[in-house]
Amino acid sequence: MKAVVLTLAVLFLTGSQARHFWQQDEPQSPWDRVKDLATVYVDVVKDGGRDYVAQFESSALGKQLNLKLLDNWDSLSSTVAKLREQIGPVTQEFWDNLEKETEVLRQEMNKDLEEVKKKVQPYLDEFQSKWHEEVELYRQKVAPLGAELREGARQKLQELQEKLSPLGEELRDRARTHVDALRAQLAPYGEQLRERLAARLQALKEGGGAALTEYRAKASEHLSALREKAKPALEDLRQGLLPVLENFRVSLLAAVDEATKKLNSQ
């Protein structure tokens, strides 16, 4: 029940992006989520791709073509792993700098969210209490009908459904009334939170124009440094791919020639 109430509060205030604020555990930072998702994605693609290559090479067609795709795949995986190892520290430095530059703004927004949370908590408690009462009332009204279903014959099923239908409609209407009341109570706080965020961003833009310019300059500088530091690693990747692609091309041409000879000899 509490999960329903908390979800409604999130939707009324700031949308789905505020879901971590209402949780007790400290949420993972956006930078850590991006890095973890990227790592998991690359690992899944790499492992899954190798399985497909291995299955193809073990098939009759793969053995006949003898393209040595698995060896090429391992060489490519080694080259990509080397690239990730070289770029990793540079990428980490970029995320750390960006997180540091936005620390003040995030702290101010956390304070605003905490203040709004304290103000709306009584409304959430009241809504939870009313909803619990409505559900309990519905359960009490339905209980005799459930006993009637167990005791009655099959022909009474339609009659029972007709009796249940208005009760369900009544519960939905009551729930809708409570939800509308809660939305009306929380709307000023959601608007207040949005206004505070807009005001802080506007103040940062007007009174701290130099700070925004500095943020953009630093971000541009970090990206330029990332591109420069990544160039050697990307060049190593390109050089590592060339022999792999050439080996694949030669193997494929040889397989095609062999197949052509077999067809001509038949």
Curated annotation (Swiss-Prot):
| sequence repeat boundaries on the chain | 67-88, 89-110, 111-121, 122-143, 144-165, 166-187, 188-209, 210-231, 232-242, 243-266
10 X approximate tandem repeats: annotated segments: 67-266
SUPFAM superfamilies found in the cross-reference section? Apolipoprotein A-I (SSF58113)
Q: What InterPro entries does its record include?
A: ApoA_E (IPR000074), Apolipoprotein_A1/A4/E (IPR050163)
- The superkingdom listed in its UniProt entry is Eukaryota
Methionine sulfoxide modification, residue list: M109
Tell me the Gene Ontology biological-process terms attached to this UniProt entry: acylglycerol homeostasis; cholesterol efflux; cholesterol metabolic process; lipoprotein metabolic process; phospholipid efflux; positive regulation of cholesterol efflux; positive regulation of phagocytosis; positive regulation of phospholipid efflux
Q: Which GO terms describe its molecular function?
A: cholesterol transfer activity; phosphatidylcholine-sterol O-acyltransferase activator activity; phospholipid binding; protein homodimerization activity
Keywords for this entry?
Cholesterol metabolism, Glycoprotein, HDL, Lipid metabolism, Lipid transport, Lipoprotein, Oxidation, Palmitate, Phosphoprotein, Repeat, Secreted, Signal, Steroid metabolism, Sterol metabolism, Transport
**Where does this one sit in the cell?**
Secreted
Show the GO cellular component annotation of the record.
chylomicron; extracellular vesicle; high-density lipoprotein particle; low-density lipoprotein particle; very-low-density lipoprotein particle
Instruction: Show which residues constitute the signal peptide.
Output: 1-18
Q: Name one Pfam family in it.
A: Apolipoprotein
Q: Post-translational modification, briefly?
A: Glycosylated.
Quaternary structure, per UniProt, is: Homodimer. Interacts with APOA1BP and CLU. Component of a sperm activating protein complex (SPAP), consisting of APOA1, an immunoglobulin heavy chain, an immunoglobulin light chain and albumin. Interacts with NDRG1. Interacts with SCGB3A2. Interacts with NAXE and YJEFN3.
Q: Of which family is this protein a member? A: Belongs to the apolipoprotein A1/A4/E family.
What this chain does, per the entry, is described as: Participates in the reverse transport of cholesterol from tissues to the liver for excretion by promoting cholesterol efflux from tissues and by acting as a cofactor for the lecithin cholesterol acyltransferase (LCAT). As part of the SPAP complex, activates spermatozoa motility.
Query: What is the official name of this protein in its record?
Result: Apolipoprotein A-I
